[in-house]
Regions:
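N-terminal helix-turn-helix DNA-binding core of bacterial DNA-binding proteins
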Residues: 28-73, 84, 156
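Pre-recognition alpha-helix immediately N-terminal to the DNA-recognition helix
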Residues: 21, 47-50, 109
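Alpha-helical structural segments
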Residues: 21, 25, 53-55, 66, ...
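Residue-level recognition of alpha-helical structural elements
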Residues: 8-15, 37, 64, 70, ...
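Exposed, interaction-prone assembly regions rather than primary DNA-binding/catalytic cores
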Residues: 135-162
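N-terminal leader segment of winged-helix/HTH proteins
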Residues: 1-40, 158, 162
């Protein structure tokens, strides 16, 4: 095989390695930002709240799919989040068999608090990177988030209530 055929693979490997390294940093930041709410919600429950904050009210099947859990698991998790007043359920007007769940004010406050802590720590880290490199990073991370199907920060819904 020629070195030409290996070059894209080696470049790809270096990109994957760099993203893995950065992901370790971001996982640590995420873990620290969740520490204050660890007794209130699990990581999967928090991810559920984030999905509702970013995508708005969801039916249980769509929510289960977005979070990556079985529908029965999503139902039990939503039961717990309803009891904690972090989400609420409402029956669809057009089809009373369909339930939609949405954040409550308390749920939105929890997501905002965790996101605020995460934002502060990421800002502190970013202050260590030269401004011109930050611009390149913004573009690259935006593409990464888009490729992964993540809703951009500026597009998070403000209509989180049912």
């Amino acid at each position: 095989m020629s070195s030409k055929s290996h070059a894209p693979s080696e470049a790809h490997d270096s990109v994957v390695d760099a993203v893995l390294s950065a992901s370790r940093v971001l996982v640590a930041v995420a873990a620290r930002s969740l520490a204050d709410v660890a007794e209130e919600v699990t990581l999967t429950q928090y991810r559920t709240l984030v999905v509702l904050a970013s995508r708005g009210p969801q039916n249980l099947a769509g929510l289960a799919d977005a979070v990556g859990v079985a529908p029965a698991t999503a139902t039990r998790m939503c039961d717990r989040l309803v009891r904690k007043d972090l989400i609420r359920r409402r029956t669809e007007r057009d089809d009373r068999r369909q339930l939609r769940v949405a954040l409550t004010v308390k749920g939105r406050s929890l997501v905002d608090a965790v996101t605020g802590r995460r934002r502060q720590e990421i800002a502190r880290i970013m202050n260590e990177i030269p401004v011109e490199q930050q611009a390149v990073l913004v573009q690259a991370l935006g593409r990464l988030a888009s490729a992964a199907g993540e809703v951009p920060e500026q597009d998070w819904t403000t209509g989180w209530d049912l």
